Amino acid sequence: MKGLDEKSTQDRNNLLATTLNYILSKSFDLKQLCIVKGKHCWALYVDVLILESDGNTLDAAVMAARAALSSTKLPGVSVEEDTESESLELSNDPNDSKSLDCSNLPLAITLCQIDSTAYFIDPTKAEETCARAILHVAVNPSGTISFMQKSSDGTIEPSILYDMIAVAQSTASTLFSQFQ
């Protein structure tokens, strides 16, 4: 069974990486990474290392990536143009840097439905395993939903889905207010 567990872990890791990339890239103004329009730009990579998971991994990964990007500083770059080429020179001055605008980066909220009407947020791994349906919702600071995905086989009735979305938005709003 070890091979199956490893494959399952790799599948979960790939899904987490793809989902995290989608959530962040849709909420981040890539223009701020431009050095010379059409020629040079910064490439940012966010690596998330999960040491141990008791469930709700996406929410923690999005929050960690959001915190990392919010504290990222890009060094100043000067562009020196001569007749044949241009060269870029990074500033050695730590004060010559710019922060990234991460004001629109969302938070992810995971909700588990356990029966036709009952659901809750922030599930553990055991709760995720027992859930009828799992819903991941990414909400930006203005309350707009930027991503939503159901990651289970169960169905969610439309009326319950709307309630779950409202709870995700309310929870995200509370969390965003804690960051201020």
Residues of each region from the PLM?
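Polyanion-binding surfaces on beta-sheet-dominated domains and ring/shell assemblies
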Residues: M1-Q180
